[in-house]
Each structure stands twice: as structure tokens, then as C-alpha cells.
Swiss-Prot record:
This is Uncharacterized protein AF_0603.
Length: 31
């Protein structure tokens, strides 16, 4: 895996987590 791929993988995970958290806050999901 190249440095670029590692960077994108890390950023993608962070973005997905942020979106997921935003969805939970918006819709009031309970887990």
C-alpha cells in the first residue's frame, strides 16, 4: 500500500465516522 493509499484510507474512515455520527445526531438513532 502506498503512502497515498494509506492517507486516503485513513481519511475515508474518518469521514465515514463523521457522517455516521452526524446521521445519529440528526435522526436520534439509539445503539
Amino acid at each position: 500500500m502506498t503512502i497515498t493509499e494509506k492517507f486516503y484510507d485513513k481519511e475515508l474512515k474518518r469521514i465515514v465516522e463523521d457522517v455516521f455520527r452526524f446521521e445519529i445526531e440528526m435522526h436520534g438513532y439509539e445503539f
